Amino acid sequence: QELYMYQDDPLGVSYQALNQALYPDHPLGVDILGTEESIKATTYEDLRLAYDTFYHPSNMNLIVVGNFDPQALLAVIEANQARKTFEPPRYHRVEEEVTAPVLPKTQLEREISQPIIELAWRFAPENLSGLELIRQRIIGEVFFELLMGPMSSAYASWYQQQWVDTNFYQSYHLDHKMHHLAIHAQSHHTSDLIAAI
């Protein structure tokens, strides 16, 4: 039922089409919900492996922000984790390079009240990790927020011309293999908005 609800959501479908266009022939472009057939074929063991993999400490990061003593907090965390035991990870990470070019244009036909626009630019992957990855991600997010976020002059101009409404947003993604900017909008002025962006 959740799969059908997702497939009936125009925004979710358009976002998945965007990922498929950005990362064709790559796991990043594959719908994580799967298909009706793959869902029916999923076993308890599959779900257990997915859960154990996702929530395994070797696959997690802890980011803490605030006014605290870092050493005292680290001592609390280490004491908490020392009481726990974890099996070695039961998975082998397979990383595929993103090699296929971005698909230039995808168009979906649906009966909706307002056209949906998904624009995206895929950037070269960055070989970053740890604090440098977080730092560069924040820099990108702030930059694009200043450039076209709701407080920017560009957004104000587009909003005044009724090219965008409150459904306009941009999202910057920087991770191990994923690096792109995506712009999402609902507009009856698609050509004007695309030209302005």
What is the meaning of each model-derived region?
Residues E87-S153:
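His/Glu-based metal-binding/catalytic segments typifying zinc-dependent metallopeptidases
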Residues Q1-R90, F123, R135, F144, ...:
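Charge-rich, well-structured scaffold segments of protease-associated domains
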